[in-house]
């Protein structure tokens, strides 16, 4: 409800908190009498949070409520279904379903570069919890990756390029966050991270994108190992907060 370009991340987290706090407003609630009361309770909760934390956000609550109400009226004109029942019935009838994840594996709340992650499961397992489909119903997992590495916002990035090559990748690859519009950080392909992602997702096929972005670069490098606590490792360490750096011998390929 109270989302704005300056505070979208804040309220996205509040939405996750509503869910895990078991007081969120769900689509199915719109078919029940009294959903407006639940909505008003949540609205007051978030307004109190803003006041308590003294957050400086410019918004018109009445305008936001009006926009929300108009959206609800449109949603209620649609047919509501139990999505997990619909999807499983489709599978039982021989239909094929393709699910698409919206975020990278390293943003996963459990297996990503915590705490620089999102608030949900972005790995293939998230398709099960998000859609209500059992793990044994998934036949193939397509791992889609870029020929180089990108990241939006803060967090560890061992192969990041803070030079003209990194800027070139961002410009040619049009690397801006899909939701926030923030420029993405760019760097060489990190095979350690890629291997980790393949493992935790159970990837069966790999698809590489944006190889053309690297056209014209005389020497293309990849990272195959990390220097970590004086040792050379080829896996993602437990904590991303501990210092890791690409091994020069293994990135110079």
Residue spans of the language-model regions?
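Catalytic core of tubulin tyrosine ligase-like
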Residues: 15-78, 82, 90-94, 102-245, ...
């Amino acid at each position: 409800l109270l989302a704005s370009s300056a505070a979208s991340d804040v309220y996205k987290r509040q939405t996750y908190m509503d869910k895990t706090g078991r007081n969120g407003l769900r689509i199915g609630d719109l078919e029940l009498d009294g959903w407006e009361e639940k909505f008003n309770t949540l609205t007051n909760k978030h307004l109190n949070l803003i006041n308590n934390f003294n957050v400086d956000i410019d918004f018109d609550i009445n305008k936001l409520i009006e926009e929300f109400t108009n959206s609800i009226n449109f949603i209620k004109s649609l047919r509501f279904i139990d999505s997990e029942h619909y999807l499983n019935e489709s599978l039982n009838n021989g239909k094929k379903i393709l699910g698409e994840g919206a975020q990278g594996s390293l943003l996963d709340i459990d297996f990503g570069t915590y705490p620089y992650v999102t608030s949900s499961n972005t790995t293939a397992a998230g398709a099960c919890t998000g859609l209500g489909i059992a793990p044994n119903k998934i036949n193939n997992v397509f791992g889609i990756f870029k020929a180089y590495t990108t990241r939006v916002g803060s967090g560890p990035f061992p192969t990041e390029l803070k030079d003209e090559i990194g800027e070139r990748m961002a410009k040619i690859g049009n690397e801006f966050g899909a939701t926030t519009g923030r420029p993405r950080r760019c760097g060489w392909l990190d095979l350690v991270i890629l291997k980790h992602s393949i493992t935790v997702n159970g990837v069966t096929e790999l698809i590489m994108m944006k190889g053309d972005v690297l056209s014209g670069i005389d020497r293309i490098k990849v990272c195959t190992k990390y220097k970590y606590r004086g040792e050379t490792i080829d896996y993602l360490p437990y904590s991303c907060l501990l210092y890791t750096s690409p091994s020069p011998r293994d990135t110079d390929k």
